[in-house]
Amino acid sequence: MPIYLDHNATTPLAPEVLEAMLPYLQGPYANASSLHRLGRASRDAIEAARAEVADLLGAQASQVIWTSGGTEANNLAIKGVMHQGGRLLYGATEHPAVMECAESLMAVPRTVVESIPVTAGGLIALDRLHAQLAQAPVTLVSVMAANNETGVIQDVAAIGRAVHEIPDALFHVDAVQAAGKLPVDVRQMGADLLTVSSHKLYGPKGVGALLRTAPVDLWPLHHGGAQ
């Protein structure tokens, strides 16, 4: 029998998670936006899950936005903030979900996209970050908390403090690789936006979340029903 050890790439579904999900996979079924009894029960289950995610990450339930995974959450954070242009800084060793999203914005009018250099050890070069922050107004800084391939763990709190010295600058943390392995507290990190993904911490695939702690309007990636 194969032994799976690559838990930095993905994790198996925990038995207790499967047990909690089965009642909703097997029915009865109801749209959580419906006002009848079954609809309200579905809504209650979603809100209970939202509260658990918030508690895990030191946030409030109202700050949790459900997504289809880490990639959508990262795109919503970055494109949602940058849709009208501005200046975006991102770490030079980010996950492709951030790096390619950032690079796609180079075609957007009035948008400047710059990478933040890292040291030989893979850490964000704080002196270079301070210099970049001082050059011109910054709209958003995006940095991953931990790198699943190199094992580098960023000093996210120090980066957050540097970002918040700049008026109106927002700080996005990609915590997909950290949540479930390291303590993640959105307040201690100073993150205005924070991304997590369920399949990295023994949950189902196809589920992620974006935490929004700052009072910022995010331009939606999709348009449709409120649910």
Which role does the model predict for each range below?
Residues 1-227:
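Pyridoxal 5′-phosphate
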